[in-house]
Design a protein with these regions (language model features):
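Local cysteine-cluster metal-coordination motifs and their immediate loop/turn environment
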Residues: 26, 31-67
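Fe-S ferredoxin-like electron-transfer domains
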Residues: 53-113
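Conserved phosphate-binding catalytic cores of ATP/NTP-utilizing and phosphoryl-transfer enzymes
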Residues: 92-109, 247-276
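Short glycine-aspartate micro-motif
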Residues: 111-115, 199-201, 276-280, 297
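Glycine-rich phosphate-binding loop of actin/hexokinase-like ATP-binding domains
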Residues: 123, 131-149, 219-234, 272-302
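N-terminal phosphate-binding loop and adjacent alpha-helix
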Residues: 142-191
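Glycine-rich phosphate-binding loop and adjoining helix at the ATP-binding site
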Residues: 149, 197-198, 211-264
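Short glycine-rich phosphate-binding loop at a beta-alpha junction
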Residues: 194-205
Length: 302
């Protein structure tokens, strides 16, 4: 869906005539610009249309704004074409008939789990008593505007705005993912007639978990690739602005790029007495081979 935006520098304290269109859209929460290269000007994917004061297709990451500029962001809608070409597939279970069975349960009966991927995010609401998934949300990770891969986001997080910390890359990416989760959790609780989540479990690669918690992943961008935090413990959701959750646990990372997403999956194979190969094929891919409580792991860009 296309958006037409008019820029007024006189009433906008966040921007100057040195701000690029991409920076403007990021700081104002305007979606629809893809930046696989993280805004370096190398991928050519962040094209937008300037309608005023001239008419031209430009790269958002390389074009400075000016007062009164009008820009058109997003794709044109056409008959038979979906608004977003990225469609996240879930397990296909139809639970719409079951929502009424879970109305009026108290907070102790409600759990939530989330997998924060580099490209996509999936969140589940779970009935603690039955173990049944009662609601699901999935979609694109909004941090894609800072780059398609983890290295682009590490670079974006390191380039903080010294004059405006709230608009630095790290803070903005944290705000993006927390806002997404807050919206989904609120929708699912309302949908299922519940009020609060007693425990929220999060799995994700090490970089995604750092960004969620507002911790700089800068050390993961250079040797020896040691993270500041390995997680594997409880956090207070309110510390990051996450609402409607009593407690939050983030699955532990094993090393720099073998994160909580693969350790969460490996928990299912710990009691298996056969040689097991576990694969996580994502934007950040991981592999684990082993038996029982001993595994050899590796990670790479998938």
């Amino acid at each position: 869906m296309q958006q037409r935006i008019t820029i007024n520098l006189n009433t906008d304290s966040k921007t100057t005539d040195k701000t690029t269109i991409l920076e403007y859209c990021r700081s104002h929460g305007i979606a629809g610009i893809e930046t696989p290269c993280g805004g370096k000007g190398t991928c050519g994917k962040c094209k937008v249309t300037v309608a005023k004061p001239y008419y031209k297709d430009v790269l958002a990451c390389q074009t400075k704004i000016c007062d009164g500029m009008e820009i058109i962001v997003g794709r044109k809608e056409s008959t038979g074409t979906k608004e977003d070409s990225m469609v996240v597939l879930t397990n296909g279970e139809n639970v719409s008939e079951k929502f009424n069975e879970h109305v009026n349960r108290n907070v102790e009966d409600t759990l939530a789990a989330c997998d924060i991927g580099t490209t996509t995010v999936v969140c589940y609401l779970i009935d603690k008593e039955t173990g049944q998934i009662i609601s699901t949300r999935s979609g694109a990770n909004p941090q894609r505007s800072f780059g398609a891969d983890v290295l682009s986001r590490i670079d974006a997080a390191a380039r903080a705005d010294d004059n405006d910390k709230a608009n630095g890359g790290l803070q903005m990416m944290q705000t993006q993912i927390v806002s997404l989760l807050n919206g989904w959790i609120s929708e699912m609780l309302t949908e299922c007639g519940r009020t609060k989540v007693s425990r929220f479990s999060v799995a994700g690669n090490t970089v995604m978990c750092h960004l969620l918690m507002g911790i700089s992943p800068e050390k993961l961008g250079k040797a020896p690739f040691m993270p500041d935090e390995y997680f594997g413990r409880e956090f207070n959701p309110l510390d990051i602005g996450l609402e409607n959750c009593q407690t939050m646990i983030i699955f532990p990372a094993v090393s720099g790029f073998v994160g909580g997403d693969i350790t969460a999956g490996m928990m299912e194979t710990v009691n298996c007495n056969e040689l097991t190969l576990y694969l996580d094929i994502g934007t950040n891919g991981e592999m684990a081979l082993g038996i029982g409580d001993r595994y050899v792991c590796c990670a790479t860009a998938a």
